[in-house]
């Protein structure tokens, strides 16, 4: 599936009491990237709602002045739901900093009843994507 990316400059107002990127701000950015991925693939942002943040694994801190790029891609679909894998990586201090899975659903605007999104996972031979799809099957 297509990979979407968003970058953020880590500024003073994004920091915690340790002087590194606040986990709450990171979570906000990860959910935003997940939403962008789901909405862009679906084509109707007004139909897309976040229903579950399955947890994020923080692997290393992010410093002020770094550029954090968040990548999102759909790794699992149901009839009305789609699970997005998001990962954040620093552009300056290279390495993966945080990752996780988020589920979004599509709903009717007026009734808020779930509606099919008609997204089908494409065929892939990419080892990373295959591994993410396998992991997504076991996410609770």
Residue map of PLM features:
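HotDog/MaoC-like acyl-thioester-processing domains
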Residues: 64, 75-140
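Hot-dog-fold acyl-thioester-processing enzymes
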Residues: 1-50, 108-140
